[in-house]
Every structure is written in structure tokens, then in C-alpha cells.
A protein has these predicted regions:
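Bacterial Sec-dependent N-terminal signal peptides
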Residues: 1-21
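Extracellular, repeat-based ectodomains that mediate carbohydrate processing or recognition
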Residues: 20-486
Length: 486
């Protein structure tokens, strides 16, 4: 008969083995983005949104970080296994700016889903260690954190066993959604994230509230308590940014909408309004754009953080990206429409920007797109603004993505004009171009393509500051691949 100690040892060993088996550290032989869809529509557009979504969603950031010390851009993405029904692989690779080569990607883990909401994000600490944060879509799957064994090295990652404080007790930090992670040499990690709360809504006790929050950690292992930013009705989707101000302080900004508490359906389908909050002391205090102190969490629709009321015009607000000028003033991009379903009936789909000039917000239309998820990313270089987005609505209209185009902003005219096409004559739609942290001129955007109306292979790409596009090889041999312009 087995003793209690033997049984206990076997149980503990099996748990440890299961944890260790999560970490794969396997080399892949190419770059394959996950293909994903949500919401069948039973019409020609087939899905609410779909395609190659290896760098989705807008609320995950960053997917890539440039290191001047290593002279490499490290990037992660939602990869696809080679199974008939591909599983989501969390993969990491780098582009070497000296040799102009990309490494073979390392498969850190298999997320055991095809849900692109579980896509990873990446960070590099002040010692050069690479961190991969494996997010989750809600509470049905766990989240993970991995750290490279060596600085600036992707050969081997080890599983971190993080904890956080909850009600004064130390708990496993094993679930986080919609993570945007930033690292500060002095204070460590700052994460904007979402957690799901049930039983708190007026309409539908089983429906979750997507609660916007933040969390911090000095070392990536021991994390603070979750501190809620917004608890308005059914919750929020937030995007964020960070900038080093001229006074040396790190400013962290959250831009978010709110989801109405609806009697039928999901409030996220009626996301509206745009709110702004900032902190310059790593989350100790928060202010609105007027530098007025705001107490958290926000609980009312009309609150001190509101900068744009889209609900009064019955318009939705899909927030994209945020970037800063040399003074630390922000610009964010968003798409407004009249409904969640794809197709012309909910148009016009207007891609817009909001810029804070130090006193007021200026809202400007960039152009019309054809889908709520036509994400665009913003750049500020040499005192000028530009925006990269799938604004050419081909080859598949009224679906996620399209052909990428670069737009330039004129301060004098206060308007956007088309600068140049980035992708052309594509067979699949390109979507979710993402800006790296500390981006280098050779690697300024990273994205995937995919057929939006049926399952397909999905390729990954990056582009430079000249608008030249470099496909990442779907399959290759050797440890490195010399990139070639498309």
C-alpha cells in the first residue's frame, strides 16, 4: 500500500512536471501567423472579424522591442502549429540590424487554443532579459510568464511562477487579459490589463464585466495588488502608451471606451466614448488631461476622464493606438461607426485621430475605412506625424484589414493626406500593423495577412521607414535568414 508521503510526492512531482512541460523551447522552421475568426455572420462577409491575426488585438502591446545594446529588434507573435486545426503557438524571434537577418523563431509554449486573444506580448528588462507574457481571453485558460535564461538570447526560456497580492494574501498571478506591459529601469514592470468580474451587472448576472486595471512589479515575479481603473457598466477596452517626459518622469497613459450594460447581447458591441487618464508616479496618483486629480476606480459614464462623447451621436468607438510628440503630448487613433456587424449598413467607418496640443483636443478625420477592426498605428518622427493602416479596402471589402497605406499629417493645414502605399496587389488582407517600442528605422511595423472569408495560411511581415516591405519566410532552413524586399 502506498504511503501518504509517496502519494503526496507523486502529486507534487506531476504538478511540477506539468508546469515544466508548458515550456517547449523548440525551434520552428518558419513564420506562420495564427488565423482566427469570431462571430459568424451568415452573409458574404462570413465573420464579424477574421484573418491573419498574429499581432492582434489593439489592446495587446508590445509585440516587438528594439534593443540598441544588442542592435536587434526582438518580436513575438501568435504563431500557428502545423496541425489540421492549428493551435496558437507563442513564438519569439529577432531581426539583427547588422546582418539584416532574422533568426529561427523559438516556440516558447503551445497555448492549446486558436484564440488570438491569447496572443503574447514581449518586454526587455534593464539587464537584457527577454520576458514573454502569455495572456488569456477571460478566465477559461491560465496565463503564463516566461523569462529568457540569458540576456538578449531567445534559445531558452524558463517559466516564472509569479504571485500577486489579493485581499492582503499572496496568490498565483495566473490570469490576465488584454495586457500592455512597460518596463522602467527604476521601478520595474507596469502592466495595464483587464480582469473579468461576474455577478456585478444589472442586466445579466452571468455576463462578465471587463474591468480595466493596472498592476506593477519590481522584478516580474512578485506583483502588487490589482488596482482598478474603470468599473463602468459592462467594462472597457483600453489602449495605452508610455513616454519619458522632458522633466525625466515616465508618463503612462490609458485611453479607453466603455461598454453599456445591455439587456440583450454584449455591451462590448456598443462600445462608446473615449476617456483619458495619465500617471507620472507609476500609478500612485492619476490625472485627466487637465492635470486634475482623478480618484479610481471610475464608475459613472460621465466622469472627469471623458474627452469625447460618441454616444450622443449614436456612434461606436474602436480605439487603436497612441503615440507622443517630443513634448510628451499624445495622439491616438480610433474608428467610429454605427454598429458592430460588418458591411456598408453600419458605415461610414471613419478612421480619426485625437491630438492634445497642451491645452485642448483636436479631432481630425484621416479617411474612411470599411471595417471596425481596420487598426492603424501612429508614428512621430522629425516633428511630423504619420499613420499606417489598411485604408485601401482591397482585396476583400468590408472585412478586417486590406492594403496598408501610410498617411502624413500637416500641422499647417491640420489634415491628413495619403503619402504612399505600403502593400500592393495582395491576394490576402493585411491587418494590425504594430509599432515596436524604441523602434529602429529598419523595423518600424510588424503585422500579418490572411484571407478574411475563409481559413488560410497567414504570413508575417515587417517594414522600414522607407515603406519597404519584408516578408518573413514561411519556411526556411538554417539558423538565420537573409531578408529580402518584397
Amino acid at each position: 500500500m502506498r504511503t501518504f508521503k509517496t502519494v503526496l510526492f507523486s502529486f507534487v512531482f506531476s504538478c511540477l512536471s506539468a508546469q515544466e512541460n508548458i515550456t517547449l523551447n523548440i525551434k520552428d522552421d518558419g513564420f506562420r501567423s495564427i488565423w482566427y475568426y469570431i462571430g459568424k455572420t451568415n452573409d458574404e462577409y462570413t465573420h464579424k472579424y477574421s484573418g491573419g491575426l498574429g499581432t492582434y488585438p489593439a489592446n495587446h502591446y508590445p509585440f516587438s522591442v528594439y534593443s540598441a545594446e544588442a542592435n536587434k529588434t526582438f518580436f513575438c507573435y501568435g504563431g500557428a502549429s502545423k496541425d489540421p486545426k492549428p493551435s496558437l503557438l507563442h513564438e519569439v524571434a529577432y531581426f539583427d540590424h547588422k546582418t539584416k537577418t532574422v533568426s529561427r523563431p523559438t516556440i516558447v509554449m503551445d497555448k492549446k487554443t486558436d484564440d488570438a486573444h491569447d496572443n503574447p506580448v514581449i518586454s526587455i528588462d534593464n539587464e537584457g532579459y527577454i520576458w514573454i507574457f502569455s495572456t488569456s481571453h477571460g478566465v477559461n485558460r491560465p496565463s503564463y510568464i516566461h523569462k529568457s535564461v540569458k540576456p538578449f538570447d531567445i534559445e531558452k526560456f524558463e517559466l516564472v511562477k509569479p504571485t500577486y497580492l489579493k485581499d492582503g494574501q499572496i496568490k498565483p498571478f495566473d490570469n490576465f487579459s488584454y495586457l500592455q506591459i512597460y518596463h522602467d529601469d527604476e521601478n520595474g514592470f507596469f502592466g495595464f490589463m483587464t480582469h473579468y468580474d461576474t455577478g456585478v451587472l444589472k442586466n445579466g448576472k452571468s455576463k462578465p464585466r471587463r474591468t480595466s486595471s493596472f498592476i506593477t512589479s519590481k522584478d516580474g515575479v512578485s506583483w502588487s495588488e490589482l488596482q482598478d481603473i474603470g468599473q463602468v457598466q459592462e467594462g472597457h477596452y483600453q489602449s495605452s502608451g508610455a513616454v519619458r517626459m522632458q522633466n525625466g518622469k515616465l508618463k503612462l497613459v490609458s485611453i479607453f471606451n466603455y461598454h453599456p450594460d445591455t439587456e440583450k447581447g454584449a455591451g462590448l458591441d456598443y462600445r462608446a466614448n473615449i476617456y483619458y487618464l495619465q500617471t507620472t508616479d507609476f500609478g500612485k496618483t492619476w490625472q485627466n488631461y487637465k492635470d486634475e486629480l482623478v480618484l479610481l476606480p471610475l464608475k459613472e459614464v460621465n466622469n472627469a476622464a471623458l474627452v469625447l462623447d460618441t454616444q450622443k451621436d449614436k456612434k461606436l468607438a474602436y480605439i487603436n493606438d497612441i503615440e507622443f510628440d517630443a513634448k510628451g503630448n499624445e495622439m491616438f487613433s480610433f474608428i467610429s461607426s454605427f454598429g458592430p456587424e460588418p458591411g456598408p449598413k453600419n458605415g461610414p467607418y471613419e478612421l480619426k485621430t485625437g491630438y492634445f496640443n497642451g491645452k485642448d483636443w483636436n479631432f481630425t478625420k484621416v479617411t474612411e475605412v470599411d471595417h471596425n477592426y481596420d487598426f492603424g498605428t501612429i508614428y512621430h518622427q522629425k516633428n511630423s506625424w504619420s499613420l499606417l493602416a489598411p485604408t485601401n479596402n482591397t482585396p476583400y471589402q468590408y472585412n478586417t484589414g486590406g492594403e496598408l497605406e501610410l498617411w502624413k499629417y500637416s500641422d499647417k493645414k491640420q489634415e491628413w493626406t495619403l503619402s504612399q502605399p505600403i502593400t500592393k496587389n495582395s491576394k490576402k488582407n493585411h491587418s494590425y500593423p504594430r509599432r515596436p517600442i524604441h523602434y529602429h528605422s529598419d523595423f518600424q511595423a510588424f503585422w500579418a495577412d490572411g484571407h478574411p472569408r475563409q481559413f488560410s495560411d497567414a504570413n508575417l511581415y515587417f517594414s522600414n521607414n522607407k515603406g519597404e516591405v519584408f516578408p518573413l519566410p514561411y519556411q526556411f532552413t538554417g539558423e538565420h535568414f537573409k531578408i529580402q524586399k518584397k
